[in-house]
Amino acid sequence: MASCWRLILFLSVTRWLSDYSEALSGLSTSYAALLRIKKSSTSPFGSKSRPRFSSPSLGTISVSPPSWRGAAQQYHSPGNLYHSSDAFRQDESVDYGPVFVQEPDDVIFPTDSDEKKVALNCEVRGNPSPSYRWLRNGTEIALESDYRYSLIDGTFIISNPSELRDSGLYQCLATNSFGSILSREATLQFAYLGNFSGRTRSAVSVREGQGVVLMCSPPPHSPEIIYSWVFNEFPSFVAEDSRRFISQETGNLYISKVQTSDVGSYICLVKNAVTNARVLSPPTPLTLRNDGVMGEYEPKIEVHFPFTVTAAKGTTVKMECFALGNPVPTITWMKVNGYIPSKSRLRKSQAVLEIPNLQLDDAGIYECTAENSRGKNSFRGQLQIFTYPHWVQKLNDTQLDSGSPLQWECKATGKPRPTYRWLKNGAPLLPQSRVDTVNGILAIQSVNQSDAGMYQCLAENKYGAIYASAELKILASPPSFELNQVKKSIIVTKDRGVLIECEPQGSPKPAISWRKGDKAVRANKRIAILPDGSLRILNASKADEGKYICQGVNIFGSAEIIASLSVKEPTRIELTPKRTELTVGESIVLNCKAIHDASLDVTFYWTLKGQPIDFEKEGGHFENIRAQASSADLMIRNILLMHAGRYGCRVQTTADSVSDEAELLVRGPPGPPGVVIVEEITESTATLSWSPATDNHSPISSYNLQARSPFSLGWQTVKTVPEVITGDMESAMAVDLNPWVEYEFRVVATNPIGTGDPSIPSRMIRTNEAVPKTAPSNVSGRSGRRHELVIAWEPVSEEFQNGEGFGYIVAFRPNGTRGWKEKMVTSSEASKFIYRDESVPPLTPFEVKVGVYNNKGDGPFSQIVVICSAEGEPTAAPTDVTATSVSVSEIFVVWKHVKESLGRPQGFEISYWKDTEPEDSVETVRTRGNESFVMLTGLEGNTLYHLTVRAYNGAGYGPPSREASTTTKRHPPREPPGNLRWEQQGSQVSLGWEPVRPLANESEVMGYKVFYRQEGHSEGQVIETQKPQAVVPLPEAGVYIIEVRAYSEGGDGTASSQIRVPSYSGGKITSAQSTLHSLSKWSSVTLLLALMLPSSSW
């Protein structure tokens, strides 16, 4: 990796060697070339971007501002009655003070940048739109004072920036009619790297084994730089190890113990961390003295971290420690009264302790120790961790009535603990008799219009500052009812209470007074003016009717509003019937009658179980019938269980609302029983229990048990003990179950009204094993080979196998004998058994039976049946086999079969093959029964075939016959009949064509076939002729399709082209005339169309 870097750096150096050749003519060629690095290195940032800081360290570059450097933060979340939200501020119709969208970032400007401009960004929103001003080091910048300054929107631009005139702290001040806010401080810093002094450096001479420090003495620079050293010539860099160390704090090169290989020329190379510019120092020669080798000595620490190291939480700190000594010292680290964090890393042969992501508990005293065989030396320093200010509590925008008190509090954390300052409209807030600022609290005893404006709380410690902004609005307006209108007409029923609201808007808060007509309203036991200004009247009567005037007054004016109060008789209601019992499927009408003041309109509302009835979504069960103005009926049709409950009728008038309820009980089939539990299981029984079902207001008369297995068609009712399960029972036994079968059970309840829904199925259980009780059925014999007895049966279903290890016992004996021979078949799926005995003659009768067994024992046998052993395979070959070629692809084969006493044939197999192919390419065709002929098809024409015939049955094949041979017919002529001509006269068509002449490998023409059919029909007729002509009758009107083929012993040849002949009863038409006739008709139509078209279309 190092060699790769060296190559890259070397190439970058040689690219610009010509720039400084004259200026460095006094130096050696290699050193002059190295020095030119400083000119060739430029900022990595092009003309379209600038570096920006993200932390207080000036060594890193980012595009985002630091969170601690005075970043003004606005918080407008709802906090109290008077605040305004951020969404409110974005409403263009609402006026509000300035709010920062973007504050200026720290900027590092490379002095050698091609873009000679610096832009400090500032964006603020507000209504009206804010104006911008800028401050440098706390003093407002006069734009007209320097031609280099310009302001575009809020962005401050400096052309041709200069470090002497322009570096410093910049702030953006945004102002509109509501006040001003000041941004965080943004630092403008210039990045540069000067040149080393051109003076020749003196040689450093030491003894071998002695330690040495080579000074770098870097040139002026900003910000920090990175140090490295070149040995003798570029690109040979000094490699750091336990003996050599380059301090990034001092830039010096430390060699703890000089060796002869260290003799040479050393050059310090520095690189600006921002611009990447590089410069090289003059060489420093290192030589060895001639007065002997340096003896061993104890370590001397030449590089160490400061006594106090200060770093920010979350950053990375690097502490250096290196010593000179002979032998070369070893560096170790420790934390006094603690442990070095596990996240720490040791770099450069342990000379650098690096601790990333610093936390507060990483602080403490750290010690480095340098040790060799001659002794040791240590250094201690303290690591202190600070944190930037961070908000815990911010400000909210606030609006207050004039004269109200204000208390704002902002809180921030940080180490050291932050102090607070307050700004108003961008300027420090000075203490006054009414204004008090203590830490983060701002208190104003009695606000007035002069206090309105933009306020900022600034929390800061020695490492940074943060801003929080808020707007204070002072409200001052006469009373108004525009936003809180009072009902002009209020209706209340007799003996009820009424509240007449009065909440005028105004600042300060208006004082409220009430009048009825011309008289002031006096408070008494029934009448009271509430703190919010509303008028409350209890137990209203006719005497309380009239016009009420509410008046609001403050220092800016008054306003009043009038409300008219009417007192009516209270509404009464009656809902009937009160309590009713029904059965599912029945219907009922509930009647709701209202007695009310005749001047009031009434509205009826229906509820079920406290919820409004949705008449459109209830499936037609409910209907609201309004027959009279003062009553309403609720019709419930085809009632369901879910319709049971309390029905409410509410009558609503403009004055009051009253309601009444009625209860409806619905009887129906029972609900599903509770969880079904299988308590005990045997081979054929299961004891079940369940929770009672809901009877739905009709006692349960009985329960029914149902079961389901993999072998049943759905749920089936099972027999139980007791046979009848009464409604008061909660358990029963299912009986007559099959052993070793998985079952699910469920329970169904029944009452006089009907049968309810079933319970949830029980868990799946399996009955216990038992000896099988079902014997195989349909025991019979099957065909097999000679000397075989084939016994077949229908396998027993798994449902009746009753346990594991199920199999079959096959017993058989020759008919008329006494002893049984038994064989075990272990497969439960087996359906046959083959017994082979060479001494058994064919067709010997046997008595057979098949039994069953499983792991629990043997089960029953089937009934005894008599079957025969297999017959023998045929022993005689067919005779008189004859093969006759029928066509180009067919051979007809016939034979005779010699009847014999054994080996009755089931059919015959014909094997055939081409003369030109080996016998292993033989093909076969089978017949069944006693047929003694077959037609072979799909053969090749003009080919010699050989064939044999043999009989077969279930025992096997008989011997083949003698071989027979024949040659298939030659192919029919492939040339179709040509020059087909026709002449129609009446209902006949005379045809003629040129004769077909076959090729040498084709069969001779025996004649011709004329195929004709009526167009649109699939079936046609054929006329055969030996001459190249024929007469075709056309019996019906229509168009006929005609084609001609030659035929030979090889079959039909290729068809001629088809002709279409229309039936024609008058005159004589030839094929040529038909063509002319068709052309004539087409020409006539074309001419007619041409005459009809306008001339412009031609």
UniProtKB/Swiss-Prot annotation:
Domain Ig-like C2-type: 98-189, 195-281, 299-384, 389-473, 479-568, 570-659
TM spans (from-to): none
Glycan-linked positions: N137, N195, N396, N448, N539, N778, N815, N930, N1001
Annotated region (Disordered), positions in chain: 956-982
Keyword Nucleus: no
Residue numbers with lipid attached (GPI-anchor amidated serine): S1071
Entry-linked Pfam families: fn3 (PF00041), I-set (PF07679), Ig_3 (PF13927)
Extent of the signal sequence: 1-23
GO cellular component term of the entry, any: GABA-ergic synapse
Keyword Lyase tagged: no
UniProt entry keywords in alphabetical sequence: Cell adhesion, Cell membrane, Disulfide bond, Glycoprotein, GPI-anchor, Immunoglobulin domain, Lipoprotein, Membrane, Repeat, Signal
Classification via Gene3D superfamilies: Immunoglobulins
Disulfide bond annotation, renumbered to this chain: C122-C172, C216-C268, C321-C368, C410-C457, C502-C550, C592-C649
Predominant location category: membrane
Coiled coil, from the record: none
GO biological-process terms attached to the record: cell adhesion; presynapse assembly; sensory perception of sound
Compartments, record wording: Cell membrane
Start and end residues of each Fibronectin type-III domain: 672-770, 775-872, 877-971, 976-1066
Protein's UniProt name: Contactin-5
Gene: Cntn5
